[in-house]
Design a protein with these regions (language model features):
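Acyl-CoA/ACP chain-elongation machinery
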Residues: 85-132, 165-179, 207-216, 233-283
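Conserved catalytic cysteine-centered active-site region
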Residues: 14-76, 85, 108-135, 223-252
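A beta-strand-loop signature enriched in Asp, Gly, Thr, and Trp
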Residues: 187-209, 213-242
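Short beta-strand segments
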Residues: 6-11, 64, 89-95, 137, ...
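Short glycine/serine- and small hydrophobic-enriched flexible loop segments
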Residues: 78-79, 146-149, 256-264
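Condensing-enzyme catalytic core mediating Claisen C-C bond formation in acyl metabolism
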Residues: 119-195, 203-204, 270-273
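Conserved small-residue
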Residues: 7, 50, 70, 77, ...
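Short, well-ordered amphipathic alpha-helical segments that serve as non-catalytic structural scaffolds
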Residues: 1, 44-46, 73, 147, ...
Length: 283
């Protein structure tokens, strides 16, 4: 039933490019220059458009939770299926926000790398001692989540199982992570508890690894807090060294990477990691 088929497509900034274009047209020409149903560039448009394209009339939602948006959408899609509200969900994230406003905004927050112009390909260097901020990327990553019964009934190739999910927040600072890794470690433990899995079952983590000084340091700490003695045994890498930070799309793309890691039994490297940082001393 198409009413059992839903969409959770997230975006951190939505149609920010469209919004900037329309603002410019409004100020330069007047209100008649602003046209189109997506004139405001609202984030829920992505989920609406996908649902209309594939005829998905089930639960439909957009999640705007900054860099966690894509993962948030996947997790809530998992819950939607687990709660019996849908059998199939398209879920993930999309982002296209390399625009003057977003670049200026993140630069003003000192989050973006501004010293890598001589070698832009190596500017994004997660966990490296010489990292200086993230490099913005664009893209999309969407997965089809469904019950095991649904997948087998249609003869689908099953890549992996989404076993558990948890969500929380630091309630500490608008951009900086908690200096003791409290929120991140609690979320990791919550996901393991929800999945009914021991810490020792984790062999690989596709890290958030943004290439910012604070995130990479405290993310490493969070892994130590959550996994304790098992933390050094886990292989950890960040995709952002290769493709940059896709913001709201990051979780969707990186979930696909995890699916491929399980399917191929190969772990991707952290591109541009050259100089070890004593604060980021896991594998």
């Amino acid at each position: 039933s198409r009413y059992r088929f839903g969409c959770n497509i997230a975006s951190g900034a939505g149609g920010i490019g469209k919004l900037e274009t329309n603002c410019r047209a409004l100020f330069d020409t007047g209100e008649g220059a602003v046209t189109g149903p997506d004139a405001l560039g609202v984030s829920n448009t992505a989920s609406q458009m996908v649902a209309m394209e594939v005829g998905a009339c089930g639960p439909n939602a957009n999640f705007v939770s900054a860099c966690a948006s894509g993962t948030h959408a996947l997790g809530e899609a998992y819950r939607t299926i687990a709660y019996g509200e849908a059998d199939v969900m398209l879920a993930g994230g999309t982002e296209a926000c390399i625009t003057p406003l977003t670049i200026s905004g993140f630069t003003s927050m000192r989050a973006m790398c501004t010293t890598g112009n001589d070698s832009p390909k190596t500017a994004s260097r997660p966990f490296d001692a010489n990292r200086c901020g993230f490099v913005m990327g664009e893209g999309a990553g969407v997965l089809l989540l469904e019950t095991e019964e649904s997948a087998k009934a249609r003869g689908a190739k099953i890549y992996c199982e989404l076993a558990g999910y948890a969500a929380n927040c630091d309630a500490f600072h608008i951009t900086a992570p908690h200096p003791e890794g409290e929120g991140m470690s609690a979320c990791l433990l919550g996901a393991l508890s929800n999945a009914g899995l021991p810490k020792e079952s984790v062999g690989y983590i596709n890290a958030h690894g943004t290439s910012t000084p604070l995130n990479d340091k405290f993310e490493t700490l969070a892994y130590k807090v959550a996994f304790e003695d098992h933390a050094p045994k886990i292989k950890i890498s960040s995709t952002k060294g290769a493709i940059g930070h896709l913001l709201g799309a990051a979780g969707g793309v990186e979930a696909i990477v995890c699916c491929k890691v399980l399917a191929e039994q190969q772990v991707p490297p952290t591109i541009n990691y050259e100089t070890p940082d004593p604060d980021c001393d896991l594998d």
